[in-house]
Regions:
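Residue position within the beta-strands of beta-propeller blades
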Residues: 37-39, 80-83, 123-126, 175-177, ...
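Beta-rich, blade/repeat-based domains predominating
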Residues: 21-33, 64-79, 107-122, 156-173, ...
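Blade-level signature of beta-propeller repeat domains, shared across WD40, Kelch, NHL, RCC1
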Residues: 258-304
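Structural signal for beta-propeller blades
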Residues: 44-47, 87-91, 130-133, 182-185, ...
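A short beta-strand motif characteristic of beta-propeller blades
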Residues: 13-19, 55-62, 99-105, 145-156, ...
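Short loop/turn segments that connect beta-strands within beta-propeller blades
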Residues: 50-54, 93-98, 136-140, 188-192, ...
């Protein structure tokens, strides 16, 4: 969790460029050891920077399609990738050192968001299926249960329109970046009607969003949102919502983004952003941490 009024350096460093990660990157994940994972959609490989390294030191020759959009890693090191190619499927890699895979499920929709909760349940956002579904990973069944959405695009509280990133907190409440409805929806456990917690239809409108693609929470349940078509990252605290980085509009300079897609924090509070149309991953340092140049700086509990 972050202190109130935390700030990030407005000029980012480029953590990975197009030569490394290919064009139009989307997926990103950082595990509890500060290992960073992304997908090069141009060659179907998973790239891994282990344990806060600045150099790619593991590459999985995964033979993924150019439509592999989302990646996550569980606490026991298993890697899950949503590959929305000709066969739309969720693939499990046994660990970071193996190309051995298992198909967990095949689906009928592109998947732009994956999440595993504390009960080892996998959640998937079905982009053109306008739903979020889930599957218990300890089960051999490939059946998926619907958690949110009706299967048709719409603006009602029980509907979604091209959902992207998802997050499930310790209460098993689901947050959805409801992309084409320009809002963040909260579906409490067991509820099919969502509550708009950020965006254009929020009852307490404090921030407008344009095609949000990712949402995560910190330990205080404050939201961090990829506001994709406004080319900025939004954060919240006890004072409400605010732009935290890339607040000057679309561009390619170190303080700008061009259609950001995914975000993740390392345990030092530094913010990593997949900057899709600039074909790079940008690192915005938490202002008090000096980008980890001093290794004894405070570590932050980023995720719930």
């Amino acid at each position: 969790m972050f202190p109130t009024n935390s700030t990030w350096d407005q000029n980012a460093t480029t953590f990975a460029n197009q030569t490394q990660i290919g064009s139009d990157p989307i997926g990103l994940y950082i595990d509890t050891n500060n290992s960073i994972y992304t997908i090069n959609k141009n060659n179907g490989r998973i790239l891994i920077w282990m344990n806060n390294s600045n150099d790619t030191n593991l590459i999985l020759y995964a033979q993924l399609s150019s439509s592999a959009y989302s990646i996550l890693v569980t606490t026991n090191g298993q890697i899950y990738v949503a590959d929305s190619g000709l066969i739309k499927q969720i693939i499990q890699f046994s660990n970071s050192y193996s190309n051995q895979t298992t198909t967990i499920a095949t689906v009928s929709s592109d998947i732009y968001g994956l999440f595993v909760d504390l009960n080892n349940t996998l959640y998937c956002s079905m982009f053109d299926g306008h739903q979020v579904v889930k599957k218990w990973l300890n089960s051999n069944s490939s059946a998926m249960a619907t958690v949110a959405g009706t299967g048709s695009a719409g603006t009602a509280s029980n509907m979604l329109s091209y959902p992207n990133g998802i997050f499930v907190d310790t209460n098993f409440d689901l947050y959805v970046a409801d992309r084409n409805n320009h809002r963040i929806q909260l579906f409490r456990l067991g509820q099919t009607n969502g509550i708009t917690v950020a965006g254009n239809t929020s009852p307490n409108l404090t921030i407008s969003l344009s095609y949000p693609t990712n949402v995560i929470l910190d330990g205080n349940k404050y939201l961090f949102i990829t506001d994709s078509n406004n080319h900025r990252i939004i954060g919240s605290d006890e004072n409400g919502f605010r732009c935290i980085v890339a607040c000057s509009g679309q561009g390619s300079t170190s303080n700008q983004l061009n259609v950001p897609r995914s975000i993740a924090f390392d345990s030092f509070g530094n913010l990593f952003v997949v900057d899709q149309n600039n074909h790079r991953i940008q690192k915005f340092c938490l202002s008090t941490n000096f980008c980890n140049r001093e290794r004894k700086k405070q570590r932050f509990d980023i995720f719930i």
